[in-house]
């Protein structure tokens, strides 16, 4: 496909003009849509990875990366996930998406997980555009083109001109590390689209798409609110929803998550610009593997395995993602720091299960993939209680609930409102993520230990001194 250079927002006024095809022939275009891939190129289960999906597209849709009558789009959150992607800060996923033939991705909140320099590098490596019309620098109000982001791009394919616009969830300010994105403003969706559309209209596109990292709960009302703007398709993201339906004159797609499924829409565009469409969703199952895509996956698997193959422990039965694993992680913080009274982490920072059998360094990178560090704060009992009340899904070590009060597990003493305690949290929380703003407000002088938040868990696993003949088993109901 011939992809024009992404165009930044200029906010100039232009008249809305109808466009038409240059001749009387109908044009066909199939949109293939995924989102929230999160680095799962190998697949969550056998035979549902990226190479399987690519083969499925070839078998079911007739797709190829250089086909002129397809456009492959993503709703964002491309890379944070298993070690094959997290260890290299998404570089492997960009190469994979280049190979598969993506044209554009919305910017998801997790695109910022590894810092602004990382997203700048990834966008430079990508043969596709990273799009967000509602992201701007706070000090200038300008689109962060210096990070490689664009508001929209124009794509010429199948004899059609497409305008593809991106949106980023407004939750990004607290759903990635707030310290990373503190200089960025994630603006109102409707206002951003209305400000941009005069410029988009001046491009005289045949079809206008909005790909977004926005959940259906917000996206469906937005489609109604901007129904006058002539947007033909919206794509969803962020909430892992699989959907293909029509709202008025607009098609809505959501591709699910982790390459386990996709959504599609096939447009037939007449010479007068009118169109017909059919749409559907499809699970990624039953296909073989595309050799070219598989080669990329295997090469990155080999590279990550070489660095991350150290066996830390042997587990009988594994531990599912959830409360037990969360507790093991936060308990390990206190195990590593005997000076701390309490440890609190957010459940959202724990992203994968502890597998059965060998547990490698790579497995723990997938479980705890972020660049967060452990921060020590001094909080009163009253402040701790408030943090636990306000923060999202806290996981706690060093405290237990007795009736209506908190008690220290070391001493069984009740948490005293005015007494100070040393509390370990992660840097995402200390920066205000997941509604933990009170931490820095209560102790502005929090001490960043510099310890990556997964390191105590790795040290603890090593300390168990397990083996293949003497694995440890964790009781889910102690």
Annotate the PLM regions.
Residues 15-18:
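C-terminal motif of bacterial Sec signal peptides marking the signal peptidase cleavage site
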Residues 454-458, 462:
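Mature, extracytoplasmic segments of signal peptide-bearing proteins
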């Amino acid at each position: 496909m011939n992809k024009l250079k992404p165009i930044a927002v200029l906010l100039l006024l232009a008249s809305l003009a109808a466009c038409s095809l240059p001749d009387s022939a109908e044009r066909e275009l199939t949109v293939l849509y995924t989102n929230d891939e999160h680095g799962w190129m190998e697949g969550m289960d056998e035979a549902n990875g990226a190479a399987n999906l690519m083969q499925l597209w070839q078998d079911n849709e007739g797709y190829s990366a250089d086909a002129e009558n397809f456009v492959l789009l993503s709703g964002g959150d491309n890379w944070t996930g298993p070690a094959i992607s997290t260890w290299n800060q998404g570089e492997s996923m960009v190469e994979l998406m280049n190979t598969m033939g993506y044209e554009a991705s919305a910017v998801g909140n997790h695109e910022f997980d590894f810092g602004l320099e990382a997203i700048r590098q990834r966008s430079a490596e990508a043969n596709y555009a990273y799009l967000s019309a509602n992201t701007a620098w706070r000090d200038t109000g300008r689109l962060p083109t210096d990070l490689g982001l664009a508001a929209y791009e124009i794509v010429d394919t199948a004899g059609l001109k497409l305008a593809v616009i991106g949106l980023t969830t407004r939750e990004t300010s607290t759903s990635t590390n707030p310290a990373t994105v503190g200089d960025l403003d994630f603006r109102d969706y409707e206002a951003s689209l209305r400000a941009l559309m005069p410029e988009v209209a001046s491009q005289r596109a045949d079809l206008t798409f909005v790909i977004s990292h926005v959940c259906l709960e917000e996206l469906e009302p937005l489609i109604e609110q901007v129904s006058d703007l002539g947007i033909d398709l919206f794509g969803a993201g962020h909430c892992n929803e699989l959907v293909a339906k029509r709202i008025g004159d607009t098609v809505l797609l959501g591709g699910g998550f982790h390459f386990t499924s996709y959504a599609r829409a096939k447009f037939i565009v007449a010479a007068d610009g009118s169109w017909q469409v059919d749409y559907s969703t499809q699970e990624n199952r039953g296909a073989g593997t595309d050799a070219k895509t598989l080669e990329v996956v295997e090469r990155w698997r080999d590279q990550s395995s070489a660095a991350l193959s150290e066996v830390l422990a042997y587990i009988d039965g594994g531990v599912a993602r959830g409360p037990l694993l969360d507790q093991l992680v936060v308990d390990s913080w206190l195990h590593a720091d005997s000076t701390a009274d309490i440890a609190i982490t957010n459940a959202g920072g724990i992203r994968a299960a502890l597998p059965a059998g060998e547990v490698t360094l790579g497995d723990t990178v997938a479980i705890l993939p972020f660049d967060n560090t452990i921060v020590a704060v001094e909080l009163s009992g009253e402040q701790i209680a408030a943090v636990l009340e306000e923060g999202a899904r806290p996981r706690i070590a060093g405290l237990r609930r007795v009736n209506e009060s908190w008690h220290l597990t070391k001493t069984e003493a009740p948490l005293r409102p005015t007494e100070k305690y040393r509390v370990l949290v992660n840097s995402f929380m200390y920066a205000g993520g997941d509604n933990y703003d009170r931490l820095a407000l209560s102790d502005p002088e929090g001490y960043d230990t510099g310890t990556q938040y997964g390191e105590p868990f790795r040290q603890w696993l090593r300390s168990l001194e397990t083996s293949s003949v003497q694995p440890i088993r964790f009781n889910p109901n102690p």
